[in-house]
Amino acid sequence: MPTINQLVRRPRKPSVSANKAPALQHNPQKRAVCVKVYTTTPKKPNSALRKVARVRIAGYGSEVIAYIPGEGHNLQEHSVVLIRGGRVKDLPGVRYHIVRGALDTKGVQGRKKARSKYGVKRGS
């Protein structure tokens, strides 16, 4: 434990937390272009075919893996998408989500609940 004199000479440093979504460069969302759309399997003990896309961020050039939420999608290579932060716990390396219903991404067909999260208009 430091003395008060030591703290006067050299104050405590505030701990700096690491950025969880560095590719967004402190923006809430960024536009990106799909490079590859594919499925991948989650870590143990889960089992599924999770839909993901490798995307190149516009005006920045870095490539990241983004998760495609919801059932079914219309994405293919060269689709323009909007990505946001938010990792997928059982997919290592996936730290971004694609925003449904924005740019080239269609909303989830037949969605009735939690519509705002999946880009579905009311009554459709």
Swiss-Prot record:
A Gene Ontology biological process term: translation
Renumbered residue ranges of the record's region Disordered: 1-24
UniProt cross-references to CDD domains, sorted A to Z: Ribosomal_S12 (cd03368)
InterPro entries recorded: NA-bd_OB-fold, Ribosomal_uS12, Ribosomal_uS12_bac
Pfam families (alphabetical): Ribosom_S12_S23
Modified residues (3-methylthioaspartic acid): 90
Any one cellular-component term (Gene Ontology): small ribosomal subunit
GO molecular function: rRNA binding; structural constituent of ribosome; tRNA binding
Superkingdom in the source lineage: Bacteria
Keyword entries, A-Z: Methylation, Ribonucleoprotein, Ribosomal protein, RNA-binding, rRNA-binding, tRNA-binding
Task performed by this protein: With S4 and S5 plays an important role in translational accuracy.
Quaternary organization: Part of the 30S ribosomal subunit. Contacts proteins S8 and S17. May interact with IF1 in the 30S initiation complex.
Similarity comment text for this entry: Belongs to the universal ribosomal protein uS12 family.
Name listed for the protein in its UniProt record: Small ribosomal subunit protein uS12
Species of provenance: Anaplasma phagocytophilum (strain HZ)
Gene name of the encoded protein: rpsL
